[in-house]
């Protein structure tokens, strides 16, 4: 009996050993092979950084007409007239009729409704001069004023395609966008032809009041305004050239958005450093506001000023090239620093005054932009 038990134990152990050996052989048939492992290599790269560009050029020019706001009326007789340095209007004196009503006085050819700004308007022979001025600038040829370096933001996406002729160099395609501002201003003193229209009125032998004067001038309920004869005695016009008579200020502000697409080349240098190059087409969308302010100080009266503004935009096709040095911080992120050149053409923007007499232009040239770019890159 003991012999039988021992025989059964030996048989059971042998059977277990045989089963274990078969199981191990079975598992061994399905061991993973090296060929079954998949290694994922990132093909896309996103770059986010800044772009600083110089080389934008602007130029300003044109011609303008500045005139004081006035209404001259008829060149003879009695009329309401407004000048740059005063006015002569219809008489506003009244008297009280028997019924106690205020009624206009019987016309006597004079008026209390007048005024002037400068003491030089009173002449030695007892007359008063009133003036209207017009300054017509000589054509201002285009004056160049280049904007300073403009910094903006850029974003691009790159797709790796493959190796170049079996080498370690790789090529791909890239697309991106960036935005940079345009801001520049300049000023110049322009020569101008000054046309002065002078109207003469009589004070009837009395002295002119102290300038500046505005009538009617009631004092204690009694109108003591010095009177001037309403009839225009004489009108004359004179034109003379004046050097640096008109101050013009030109200002341009805006931005341009660049969309680019092209091919890229990746050249490994070391384990962490590499060089990258790209070139392709670019489409720039530029939007700018052009402001012009002019001023002219005549002999009498306040400074004559005029301001005008216009907004414009343009689509400018062109090309770009850039070269970059890249540093890999790890397998999926890195830094880049490079140089860029972009040519996007030019356009002309014009601004015209409300009366259509002044017209100035600015030429915006984006055909030779160059600068630096830097930022971070992420692969996925």
What are these regions (language model features)?
Residues 1-40:
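Cleavable N-terminal export/targeting peptides
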Residues 21, 31-42, 147, 158-173, ...:
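Short loop/turn motifs that connect adjacent beta-strands in outer-membrane beta-barrel proteins
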Residues 23, 366-380:
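Outer-membrane beta-barrel "beta-signal"
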Residues 50-54, 177-183, 257, 281-289, ...:
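Transmembrane beta-strands of outer-membrane beta-barrel pores
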Residues 53-150, 314:
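Surface-exposed strand-loop-strand hairpins of Gram-negative outer-membrane beta-barrel proteins
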Residues 148-154, 170, 254-260, 274-276, ...:
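Transmembrane beta-barrel architecture of outer-membrane proteins
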Residues 153-159, 175-177, 259-267, 279-283, ...:
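Residues on the lipid-exposed face of transmembrane beta-strands in outer-membrane beta-barrel proteins
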């Amino acid at each position: 009996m003991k012999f039988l038990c021992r025989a059964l134990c030996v048989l059971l152990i042998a059977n277990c050993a045989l089963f274990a050996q078969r199981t191990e052989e079975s598992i061994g048939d399905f061991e993973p092979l090296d060929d079954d492992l998949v290694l994922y290599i990132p093909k896309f790269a996103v770059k986010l950084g800044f772009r600083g560009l110089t080389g934008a050029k602007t130029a300003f020019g044109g011609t303008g007409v500045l005139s004081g706001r006035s209404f001259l009326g008829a060149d003879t007789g009695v009329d309401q007239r407004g000048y740059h340095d005063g006015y002569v209007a219809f008489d506003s004196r009244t008297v009280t009729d028997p019924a106690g009503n205020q009624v206009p006085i019987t016309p006597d050819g004079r008026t209390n409704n007048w005024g002037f700004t400068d003491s030089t308007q009173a002449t030695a022979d007892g007359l008063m001069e009133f003036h209207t001025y017009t300054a017509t600038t000589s054509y201002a040829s285009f004056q160049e004023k280049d904007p300073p370096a403009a910094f903006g933001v850029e974003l691009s996406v790159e797709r790796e395609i493959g190796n170049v002729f079996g080498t370690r160099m790789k090529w791909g395609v890239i697309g991106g966008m960036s935005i940079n501002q345009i801001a520049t201003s300049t000023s110049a003193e322009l020569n101008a032809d000054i046309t002065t229209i002078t109207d003469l009125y009589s004070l009837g032998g009395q002295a002119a009041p102290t300038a500046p004067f505005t009538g009617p001038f009631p004092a204690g309920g009694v109108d003591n305004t010095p009177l001037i004869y309403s009839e225009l005695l004489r009108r004359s016009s004179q034109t003379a050239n004046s050097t640096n008579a008109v101050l013009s200020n030109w200002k341009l502000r805006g931005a341009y958005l660049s969309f680019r697409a092209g091919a890229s080349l990746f050249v490994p240098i070391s384990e962490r450093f590499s060089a990258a190059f790209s070139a392709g087409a670019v489409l720039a969308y530029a939007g700018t506001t052009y402001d012009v302010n002019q001023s002219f100080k005549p002999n009498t009266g306040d400074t004559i000023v005029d301001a005008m503004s216009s907004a414009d935009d343009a689509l400018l096709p062109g090309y770009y090239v850039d070269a970059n040095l890249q540093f890999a911080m790890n397998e999926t992120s890195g830094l880049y620093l490079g140089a860029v050149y972009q040519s996007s053409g030019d356009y002309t923007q014009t601004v015209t005054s409300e009366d259509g007499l002044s017209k100035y232009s600015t030429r915006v040239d984006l055909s030779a932009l160059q600068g630096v770019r830097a930022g971070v890159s992420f692969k996925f």
